[in-house]
Each structure stands twice: as C-alpha cells, then as structure tokens.
Amino acid sequence: LHPVVKDENDQRKDVDEVFEALKYLSKDNQIIITYPNFDPGYQYIINKIIDIKKKIKDIKVVKHLGGTNYHSLLHYIGKNKKGFCMGNSSSGIKETIFFNCPTLNIGDRQNSRLKPKNVVDVKANKNQIISKINKLNNHKVYENPYKLSGKFNKIPDEIVKKFFRNDFKFKKCTI
C-alpha cells in the first residue's frame, strides 16, 4: 500500500480501513506485506505495518521483495490458483495479469490506468475489501491488454536494425 496525496486525515482513515481488513483476512490467509514508497505519508503506513506485525505473528513483512522475488510470488499465486495481490500499486494493475494473479486494487490511486479484468476495484473500506475478496478467487485466465502482438513485437528489433551496428546486443525484457 502506497501513500496517496490527499488530505492527511482521509489518508490515515483509508490506511486504517485497509489494515483492519488485513487483520480480519489474516485469520484464513497467509499475508505478506511490503513497505510503501517514500511519498508523503509513508511513515504512517510503516508504523501500521510494524503494529500489525507485533499483533499478528504469522504476517510476513518484507521491506522490499525486489523484482525477481515479487514476480516469483505472483507466479506462485497464479500457478497454484491460491491467493491474490492487494494494494494500490501500479504493479498490481500492470504486472499481475502476466501471472494470472487476481488483484484487489484499493482506492483511487490508479483510477486513470487501463485495468485488465483480473483487477477488481474497491474503496478503502474494511467491509468492502472483505466482500470483494470472494470475486478474486476465481483465477480465470483473462485477456492481457498490455500484451503486444503481431507487428508491434517487431518494433524494437526494427529500431535496433536501423540505428545501431549489426553487432549490437538487444536484451529482451519482461515486466
């Protein structure tokens, strides 16, 4: 969960609602929490993470998973058809679809983004978060709006051929 630039009291209320939902969800789910980015308001979220970890020992807290561990976790969730991603990060919108990982997008931080159908939007409200979790556990395979096909996949290769030497090494990347 990342801070959202808005009124500090509203932001704290939203964060409190999310952490109340996490407390409830921890009864039946293994929870891994990562630290927020460093936007204004991050320290309040970190304090909530520390507090929930003290109260619920089974919750795992990781300051930063890193790309490989994060993508491995998404892959595990998608492959085993157990679990989901929850938060307000753009990675939940753009990356989880590649791993068939259901995602609960909390709040309005990602409102302007194109969202695949594995993403379910919800307000930062404990009861709404809990009720929307049931919609996530279907693990259907959805069309990926971010996947390029046909001639679009050739664009990077064509750029390299036109502007670089023949011995230039083009590294294929994934998100």
Describe each PLM feature range:
Residues 1-175:
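Nucleotide-activated sugar donor-binding and catalytic core shared by glycosyltransferases
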